[in-house]
Every structure is written in C-alpha cells, then in structure tokens.
Amino acid sequence: MDNLKKETMPERTHMNTKYANLMLFRLLEVLYDSKGKGAKFRTCILGKEDIVDHYRDEGLQFSTESWEENRDRCRDFLKEQGIIEDLSCNIENNEAEITIESCIHIPMEEMLKNEEVPPYTCIPANLFAYGVERATGKQTEIAKIETGKDACKIKMLLFQEED
C-alpha cells in the first residue's frame, strides 16, 4: 500500500456518498461471497494505518498512553470528515462496547443486509481499534456488529498476542 501517496490523491471538496457506498457495498459483497465469514479477517485493516498515514500532516495522531484520548481524536476526526455524528465507547474486562451514530456507511450496510450479507467490517471502528492498539499494546478483533437505522453497536475484543 506504499504506492498510495497523499500527493497522488486528488483533492475534492465533495464526494458522492451514494456512489462511494455502492462501490464499497459491491466490494464487500464480492469479498463475502468468495471468503464467507473469513472476509472479516481480510478487512480488519481497512481504515487503520492507511488513514493515519494519509492524514498525519493534518494532525491525525494517536497517543501511546491513553485509549480515551485516542477515542476522542478518532471521534473528532471522523466528525470533521463528515463520516459520523458521534462515537462513544467503554472498555471493561478487555471488551469494548462501541456506538457509532449517523455513519455515512449505514445505507451500504442496509444494502448488504438486503443481500443477506451480515455486517462484518466497520471502517470507523477499525480506525478506533488502531488507536486502542497504540495505547494499550493489545490486539483487537471486532466480534460483533449490530446495525441500526441511526446507529451501529460494535463489540470489540482486546487481547494480548502471545509470542
């Protein structure tokens, strides 16, 4: 992914979200059709390092000390980009309960649901997971995604990778 440089990305003042969600829907549908439930392990990196690297010059950086600070940075960044209206999270016993409100990807999730493809990835949650990983030194895995009309609830597990 090193060839994806910020300089090569055209600057746009407006993105057609209907088009973007349709393309994302088709990509996720095709991946699920070919990999089944294993598709979630192929999409867990979407929205992590690539987003952070791309927006670092604009101030997107994550702390290595506080997952709460990273939650706030992630939420603020996604709100500024017009991706979500809010993100909240609580972590207890290595289990994170995340709520993402008014995400631009909700219509895409509805299209997947209509094709009987269960929700298996969440790009905003992946970015938050990266912030949690940076602060805690633990790995993360999205265990469950419940989509709703106005919000999604995500359960994310934290675990220490064994050598």
Where are these predicted regions, by residue range?
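N-terminal accessory segment detector
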Residues: 1-120, 139-153, 157-163
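Active-site helix/loop of acyl-thioester processing domains in fatty-acid/polyketide metabolism
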Residues: 118-137
